[in-house]
């Protein structure tokens, strides 16, 4: 799964993948548009937790003025 949100100056991306051990990982990447600065954070979650966490993050992005691009 890949989701991307943007505001006028910032971006926020979520990747959900399976790692080499078979665990689900949720990686969040964020930063400024046109800027090399940014950061990322990785979380290991169960399948049930992934859906809830993605929805929680999407709700936060919308509340903060981001628009979903992908």
Language-model features: locations:
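Mixed-charge, Lys/Arg-enriched low-complexity segments
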Residues: 36-70
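Negatively charged, low-complexity tracts enriched in Asp/Glu with abundant Ser/Thr
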Residues: 1-8, 35-36, 47
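Short aromatic-glycine-(Arg/Gly/Cys) micro-motifs in beta-strand/loop hairpins
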Residues: 15-41, 55-56
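Alpha-helical structural elements
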Residues: 6-7, 25, 61
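Generic alpha-helical secondary structure signal
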Residues: 6, 15-16, 48, 70
């Amino acid at each position: 799964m890949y989701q991307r949100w943007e505001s006028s100056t910032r971006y926020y991306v979520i990747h959900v993948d399976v790692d080499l051990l078979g665990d689900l990982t949720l990686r969040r990447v964020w930063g400024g548009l046109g800027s090399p600065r940014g950061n990322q954070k990785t979380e290991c979650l169960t399948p049930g937790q992934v859906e809830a966490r993605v929805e929680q993050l999407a709700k936060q992005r919308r509340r903060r003025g981001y628009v979903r691009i992908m």
